[in-house]
Amino acid sequence: EKQSFLSLDMPNRLLFYPKTVPNPKNTKENEVLFVMKILTSTQFKELDKYTIEHEPVSSTDLMERAAKAIAAELKSRWTTATRFIVFAGPGNNGGDALAVSRLLCNAGYTVQTYLFNITGRLSDDCLNNKKRLENLAGLLFTEVSSQFSFPEVDEKDVIVDGLFGTGLNKPLDGGYAGLVKRINASPAKVVSIDIPSGLMSEDNTYNNSSAIVRADLTLTIQLPKLAFFFGENQKYLGEVNPMDIGLSAEGLAA
């Protein structure tokens, strides 16, 4: 039975790179230490902008680059016998998910995609990728504006979580919280794009643990997020695999 989606209960930081440093005590001679710099969500936006302006590359093409890296990783782990169920949100995380859907479908996978457009407002890049999906043969695509029924899934399926990324600034509630609960209760493997939906990228103060996706695999864009280093968040992340999409090294060093 369908229900209304909205009423469903349900300092300086930067990149990971190898750098030889003078050996402190208790390290082996010639040992290479790793210096990890971690970006805030604002700094990530600035790095994206810097890459777009200085490479130069369009934001749509940069999103396509991320989607290709993610799709390649998924194809390396699962055969075309696997069904992917993709949940895309209205922002750029959702745009990534829609682009991944298209690439998987074109590679011969069965893909069932849901775009949650509750407010009627999509980011520009999400809208562009929606348009590229609409006439794609073989893709099961549903745009959700109010009514939603969670699909039947089994342990052989893979759910791709592309609902919300690092731009999230408040806990998920209503239909989105209910959707996350259904994802977490499902027998399918769960892969999150960039960060598990519902998890704040920098601060645990406002996390609602019952409304955060518990991923088996997190394919994070370019760099680990600050929240990944908090012990209490490990249960949401699963395996973390950074996807190098060629963001500007010059911008990272700035």
Q: Across the structure, where does each feature detected by a protein language model lie?
A:
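Nucleotide and nucleotide-moiety/phosphate-recognizing core
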Residues: 71-163, 171-193
